[in-house]
């Protein structure tokens, strides 16, 4: 038997450029065991193996490869989106660094017989490897094309200085961003592409112009664009310094200004100025000195990556002075240096969704078109060639679809790499399709010429690229984008989607094409796996898409198929099912608390507080997008995350969400602490007993007080003592069978408080016990001496009949059923209360409307 590290491929994965890595003590048998044959056909094969002396050595190589390729790994899977040659080189480098001997076998085959089938011994799931030894091997996603485009493509606007009316959300963003800067010194503004982040930045930096402001951008073109916009907003060039490598003078109306990279001049200008605005590229930031009151980092997701000093991280990691404002549409959380680091980046002070920009009319709308795999006339020689031909035909179908509505459509095609772009370009040109190609290995002049030709074309045209035009490039007439290869990064997906969404008069909606290797003859959930990352990214920016996935019959969304023969509705149903439940179809991925759209869930919380005058109850239900949810689950998650945030622990909440919560009435007391605050109620109890000669008088421990925000101290005390009475023993065991009450679930500190307060007046609050069991009869009724709480409840029941004035004074609204329904009478009668959530043993869930006329609203 051969032990070793391996890279395997299956046709279903190959279409997505995914490769399986693993280790085994038996290379001959590995691809034949259940984990490979249960859910896949028997078409697995090894790309290569590294045969090792032991299985443990192979496991270390696998762990090292997964660590070094972490940015190309499918989450929680041993799948890498890398070419086999790249993985092979990485595996060999890892083995050498870990001093593991190996034998490399390319495209190996191993004989399988009965003697090779043995049970492998298990190993610890997390082998100990030195990550420090491997850190230099970590593969960082190459973004050279992004930065290259920044410095090649720039089209000046025709705007002139005019009065600009700020949009309402821009004012709100500026206000919340500035407040968070004053509070913590750091703030992130997460705003969708094309929604005016620069204007918001201007509104904020205007508060700092008496001092020094640094505005960092990721390229020369964006530097010019930012300068133009700030100039239009009213910034004077007299107090502006541009730091960048382009010596071309920039002319704005009658003003002009030059960039510089002279370190002596830059340092002197910054240090001597009392007020100054510096606009610089990240690449030139090493020329700056640390002397700013505010530092704005535009497109700040580009700062993220490996934790090391480089031009993009220089200011972030080295500068100590000033407040920090970070602007992005797509935060990045999947790198060692990421925006999860609250100490460096702060949190999101304001968020503006892509869908909000569309509905407000600032961003062009779009439709999703999934493109089915066509049938090929002839069976091709290999899988790679087949996949290429299918994608070519899908691109042609997409262009034909556009031409039915647009005379001269323009479509960007995003490819996996430059190699794929070249191959598709050659095929399309051979077929007579007007296609262009641009990539970072071409001369700058060629790229600019190609881009100009694409923008000015009067014919239907396709432009193939890998990442060159993914960010920051304006193509006003662009109509569509086509993903020729799956993308897994939410940042890449959203940035690509936004390319054709610039708003123009009479511009038709844009189209996003998602090709799938699916047709009506080969439908299975696995073939939808490539769209799951896309759908997750889009759902986070578009709550309407999220709701559509939950309930397509009630929430329409522009999503369809082209090239599909047969039941399009069935294909759409399968696609939605794969997105919601995954390709295994087991777990509802969309209804977890952290996935619920914040605005919708918070709106229900706010409605409950403001309309119903209370915080959620444990059995409140929530009907969202067709899903039947228990609102208390989300509410508890919010409270837990809020407390983590306030304790400066890792939290799922961002500052803008915390601000939303703290805007609610009594959030920090009733919202977080609950309707029955212990210390407050104990203080009232102590005062009450002192004023009433040690008599509790009357307490309601049946309906549990009143949970409303307007509750009287006596109503809150009733709720507290109800829980005390309930916790002093339980009457039922499992399966609802009667048993002696033995439980005592009152926390020790609370028991001490009750002993101290009631003890002052010789009042008995504990129930009688024998050998730890409550005294009770055969029917489970308590037979011990009544406690002072029970006596007070008897008095309460008498007063309901004989002393209604007393009841109304301390339990207002009791006679109208307020306490019985735990709702204000007018809320109960009008049906405004949240529905009651009920789950059944068979898995069904139901929301029952709380009102005089109950009716089911969801089954």
UniProtKB/Swiss-Prot annotation:
Broad enzyme group: hydrolase
| Pfam families cross-referenced by the UniProt entry | Helicase_C, ResIII, T5orf172
Molecular function as annotated in GO: ATP binding; DNA binding; helicase activity; hydrolase activity
Keyword vocabulary terms for this entry? ATP-binding, Helicase, Hydrolase, Nucleotide-binding
What sequence ranges are listed for the domain Helicase C-terminal?
Answer: 394-553
**Chain ranges for the short sequence motif DEAH box as given in the UniProt record:** 298-301
Domain (Helicase ATP-binding) spans 178-349
Q: Which SMART domains match?
A: DEXDc
Quote the SUPFAM superfamilies the UniProt record gives. P-loop containing nucleoside triphosphate hydrolases
So where does ATP get bound? 191-198
The keyword Hydrolase appears for this protein: yes
Family that this chain belongs to: Belongs to the asfivirus helicase A859L family.
- Name of the protein this chain belongs to: Probable helicase A859L
Whose protein is this, by species? African swine fever virus (isolate Tick/Malawi/Lil 20-1/1983) (ASFV)
């Amino acid at each position: 038997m051969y032990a070793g590290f391996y890279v395997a491929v299956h046709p279903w994965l190959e279409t997505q450029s995914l490769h399986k890595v693993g280790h085994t003590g038996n290379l001959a048998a590995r691809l034949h065991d259940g984990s490979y044959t249960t859910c896949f056909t028997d078409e697995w094969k090894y790309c290569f193996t590294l045969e090792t002396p032991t299985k443990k050595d192979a496991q270390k190589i696998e762990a090292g490869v997964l660590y070094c390729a972490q940015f190309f790994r499918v989450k929680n899977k041993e799948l890498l989106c890398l070419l086999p040659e790249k993985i092979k080189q990485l595996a060999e480098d890892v083995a050498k660094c870990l001093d593991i001997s190996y034998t490399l076998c390319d495209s190996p085959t191993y004989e399988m017989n009965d003697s090779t089938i043995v049970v492998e011994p298990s190993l610890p799931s997390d082998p100990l490897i030195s990550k420090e030894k491997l850190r230099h091997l970590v593969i960082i996603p190459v973004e050279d094309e992004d930065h290259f485009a920044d410095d090649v493509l720039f089209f000046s606007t025709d705007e002139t200085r005019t009065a600009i009316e700020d949009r309402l959300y821009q004012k709100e963003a500026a206000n919340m961003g500035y407040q968070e800067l004053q509070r913590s010194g750091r703030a992130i503004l997460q705003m969708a592409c094309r929604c005016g982040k620069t204007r918001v930045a201007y509104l904020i930096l205007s508060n700092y112009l008496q001092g020094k402001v640094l505005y960092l951008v990721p390229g020369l073109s964006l530097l010019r664009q930012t300068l133009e916009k700030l100039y239009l907003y009213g910034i004077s060039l007299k107090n502006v310094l541009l730091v960048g490598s382009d010596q071309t003078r920039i002319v704005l109306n009658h003003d002009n200004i030059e960039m510089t990279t002279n370190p002596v001049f830059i340092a002197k200008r910054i240090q001597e100025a009392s007020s100054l605005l510096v606009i610089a590229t990240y690449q030139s930031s090493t020329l700056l000195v640390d002397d700013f009151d505010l530092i704005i980092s535009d497109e700040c997701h580009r700062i993220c990556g490996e934790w090391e000093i480089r031009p993009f991280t220089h200011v972030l990691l080295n500068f100590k002075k000033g407040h920090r404002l970070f602007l992005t549409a797509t935060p990045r959380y999947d790198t060692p240096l990421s925006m999860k680091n609250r100490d460096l980046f702060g949190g999101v002070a304001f968020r503006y969704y892509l869908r909000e920009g569309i509905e407000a009319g600032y961003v062009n709308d779009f439709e999703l078109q999934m493109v089915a795999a066509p049938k090929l006339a002839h069976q091709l020689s290999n899988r790679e060639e087949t996949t290429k031909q299918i994608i070519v035909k899908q691109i042609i179908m997409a262009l034909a679809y556009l031409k039915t509505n647009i005379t001269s459509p323009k479509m960007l095609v995003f490819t996996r790499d430059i190699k794929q772009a070249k191959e598709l370009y050659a095929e399309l040109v051979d077929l007579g399709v007007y296609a262009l190609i641009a990539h970072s290995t071409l001369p700058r002049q060629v790229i600019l010429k190609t881009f100009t030709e694409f923008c000015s074309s009067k014919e239907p045209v396709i432009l193939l690229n890998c990442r060159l035009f993914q960010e920051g490039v304006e193509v006003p007439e662009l109509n569509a984008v086509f993903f020729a290869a799956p993308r897994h990064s939410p940042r890449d997906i959203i940035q690509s989607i936004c390319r054709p969404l610039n708003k123009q008069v009479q511009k038709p909606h844009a189209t996003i094409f998602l090709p799938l290797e699916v047709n009506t003859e080969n439908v299975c959930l696995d073939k939808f796996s490539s769209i799951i990352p896309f759908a997750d990214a889009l759902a986070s920016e578009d709550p309407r898409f999220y709701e559509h996935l939950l309930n397509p019959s009630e929430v329409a969304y522009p999503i369809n198929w082209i090239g599909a023969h047969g039941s399009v509705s069935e294909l759409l149903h399968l696609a939605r099912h794969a997105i919601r439940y995954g390709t295994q179809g087991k777990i509802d991925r969309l209804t977890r608390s952290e996935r619920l759209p914040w605005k919708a869930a918070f709106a229900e919380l706010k409605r409950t507080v403001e309309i119903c005058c209370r915080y959620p109850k444990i059995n409140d239900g929530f009907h969202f997008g067709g899903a039947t949810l228990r609102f208390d689950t989300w509410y508890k998650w919010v409270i837990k995350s809020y407390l983590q945030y306030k304790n400066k622990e890792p939290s799922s909440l961002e500052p803008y969400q915390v601000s939303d919560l703290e805007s609610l009435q009594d959030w920090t007391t009733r919202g977080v602490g609950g309707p029955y605050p212990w210390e407050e109620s104990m203080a009232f109890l102590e005062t009450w007993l002192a004023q009433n000669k040690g008599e509790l008088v009357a307490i309601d421990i049946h309906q549990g007080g009143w949970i409303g925000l307007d509750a009287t101290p006596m109503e809150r005390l009733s709720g507290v003592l109800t829980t005390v009475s309930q916790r002093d023993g339980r009457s039922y065991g499992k399966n609802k069978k009667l048993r002696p009450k033995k439980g005592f679930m009152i926390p020790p500190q609370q028991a001490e408080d009750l002993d101290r307060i009631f003890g002052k007046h010789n009042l008995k609050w504990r129930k009688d016990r024998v050998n730890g069991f409550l005294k009770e009869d055969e029917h489970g009724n308590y037979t011990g001496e009544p406690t002072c709480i029970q006596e007070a409840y008897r008095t309460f029941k008498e007063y309901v009949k004989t002393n209604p004035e007393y009841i109304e004074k301390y339990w207002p609204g009791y006679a109208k059923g307020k306490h019985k329904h735990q709702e204000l009478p007018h809320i109960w009668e009008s049906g405004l209360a949240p529905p009651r959530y009920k789950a059944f043993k068979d898995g069904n869930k139901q929301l029952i409307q709380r009102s005089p006329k109950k009716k089911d609203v969801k089954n």
